[in-house]
């Protein structure tokens, strides 16, 4: 979480005091030090899941293993995450299960956002029916949409497009915050994005907010 929030607010570090900058960079160094250990553990889990997928007999079981593989890859290897998101869609089609299909589409949406394929992401978004989603799936979807519009706002600085995308980002953040447990990992991530993308909040306050929610 700290790594994510650091990257979200890093452009404001130059406006902070030297002590604040040192504090934030110390957190980043700590997170980078854990990267190799984290990746090795991920690869071990992925290998086990692939073996399970190879021997899985039911389509339901195959779907959920593909979904788990997507989740394992989604944090660091987006092309592989895309492969298993697509496989999940194929399994959901065979099962004719609307809720599983919406979840798989949401996974595909994440892959397109992560790859910067925003047009493809919008196309997938327009196919998603949130009325078929569980609360948990809606939490994930609203979070993804807030990030999509955050990226579009960053890519389109000209008005009226920039303000339009900022407003949509803020609106999806609000939707996510309404159904996320307050103070949770996901809640703080969305709140950080809402704070970061709000043009009315000075950079000093954004950095102070970052320090507050990452304080152990």
Predicted feature descriptions by range:
Residues 1-4, 19:
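Short, Lys/Arg-enriched, disordered terminal segments
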Residues 14-216:
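A "functional boundary" signal
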Residues 3-12:
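Sec-dependent N-terminal signal peptides
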